A protein has these predicted regions:
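M14 metallocarboxypeptidase catalytic domain recognition
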Residues: 2-7, 13-417
Length: 417
């Protein structure tokens, strides 16, 4: 028996060394309707339980709002029994997740850095180095530290003139949300090269702290091994790695005993053993706190669902400026809709689902950055986290338009100078 365990461990190590990728053949995604509190409780419990193997692409929130669940083949019978025993109704949304993964990237991409495919961690870092060298008059390389696996967390400060107020963009804190990082690099390029007068105005009237990948370990792992990896890669448990960095911030953090996060290290919403236990979040917070006089807006980029959320996620209590945050969000959503008709919904975060220890609750509640928003990019669920690369540019275009609307309305209401 001991020999078997040793040999199995060696095989696993060799598999990781040669870059064997996890496959998701015949993994299915179902949309499950939630009609009563008993059904909702089962889904909450299922999301938080150890080794459940179910991946909630759209989380349980409240009665009347459906969830999306990825079900592995070996759980198909169990899933069917859960659906039957509690009279759930469900529909098959994605019959084979691996097919979407195989089709996510173009078959014959052009050479050079462009926005026709999703780029690896190394390629993004190389591109950041290149554009800093090419635009050293307005770009400064910045870093807020190192990840658990000693990956430098690199970004840029874009500044056309001294004294500008600043906007901070945090992206790819959830590593499987590839569209977030691709959109962020596109925005950097547009801020540098666009001749559109509205883009030029927001690029040059504000300083921009931009970090395309704030969870580099997870992002690298999502390319090399497990496309659906969400968390960091830290070790707090013998069997399961990582914590959800967007449940790990130290404002109203909770240990996972409530509905806003999990205390199970194997859960995708594991809050970590303590606030800021993750290097990626603690160092980010320190970076922001050192610049709170400068940073006037904080944006957190995610996917999917086509939403724009503002604080709070941990409580139903409204921010004192909730009406303005809603109005600014609606102005952003209206501008976003114009290029392609994409309809974003604007919410207080808690009205969608309870999420404790998230970044925008911390920036608003602890760092005092009133204009704190989280985007959930395309799509509405057809592809989920596996948005085809041919949607990178359309998504980026509409997000840029939303930033124009958001900044214009924030200025009009007196929240930006």
């Amino acid at each position: 028996m001991k020999l078997f365990v040793v040999l199995t461990s060696v095989v696993l190590l060799i598999g990781c060394a040669v870059g064997v990728k996890d496959r998701f053949d015949n993994y299915k995604v179902y949309t499950v309707n939630v009609d009563n509190e008993a059904q909702l409780k089962v889904l909450f419990d299922l999301e938080k339980v150890a080794f459940s193997s179910y991946d909630f692409w759209k989380r349980p929130t409240k009665v009347g709002l459906p969830v999306d669940i990825m079900v592995p083949p070996h759980k198909a019978s169990e899933f069917d029994e859960i659906m039957r025993s509690l009279s759930f109704t469900s529909t098959l949304k994605i019959p084979n997740v691996q097919v979407l993964i195989d089709n996510e990237q173009p078959k014959n991409p052009r050479d050079g850095f462009n926005w026709e495919r999703y780029w690896t961690m190394d390629e993004i870092n190389e591109w950041l180095d290149q554009i800093v060298a090419e635009h050293s008059d307005v770009l400064t390389p910045i870093s807020y530290g190192y990840s658990y696996e000693l990956e430098e967390i690199k970004g840029v400060l874009l500044s056309y003139r001294p004294g500008n107020p600043a906007i901070f963009i945090e992206s790819l804190i959830h590593s499987r949300e590839w569209i977030a990082g691709a959109t962020t690099t596109w925005l950097i390029n547009e801020f540098l090269t666009s001749t559109d007068p509205e883009i030029r105005r927001i690029a040059e009237s504000y300083d921009w702290y931009i970090f395309p990948v704030t969870n580099p370990d997870g992002y690298r792992y999502s390319h090399d091994v497990n496309r659906m990896w969400r968390k960091t890669r830290s070790r707090h448990d013998l069997y399961c790695l990582g914590a959800d960095p967007n449940r790990n911030f130290g404002h109203m953090w909770q240990d996972g005993t409530g509905p806003g996060a999990s205390n199970d290290p194997c859960s995708d919403i594991f809050a970590g053993p303590a606030p800021f236990s993750e290097l990626e979040t603690g160092q980010l917070a320190n970076f922001v706190l050192q610049r709170t006089d400068h940073i006037k807006m904080y944006l957190s980029f995610h996917s999917f669902l086509e939403l724009l959320l503002y604080p709070f996620g941990y409580t139903a209590n409204q921010s004192p400026i909730a009406a303005d945050l809603q109005q600014i969000g609606e102005a952003a959503a209206e501008r976003l809709r114009q290029p392609f008709g994409t309809e974003y919904r604007v919410f207080n975060g808690h009205s969608l689902y309870i999420a404790t220890g998230n970044s925008i609750d911390w920036t608003y509640g602890a760092a005092g950055i009133n204009l704190s928003y989280a985007y959930e990019f395309r799509d509405d669920g057809t592809y989920g986290f596996l948005l085809p690369a041919d949607q990178i540019i359309p998504n980026s275009i509409e997000v840029m338009q939303s930033l124009i609307g958001m900044i214009d309305e924030s200025e009009r209401l007196g929240h930006l100078p």
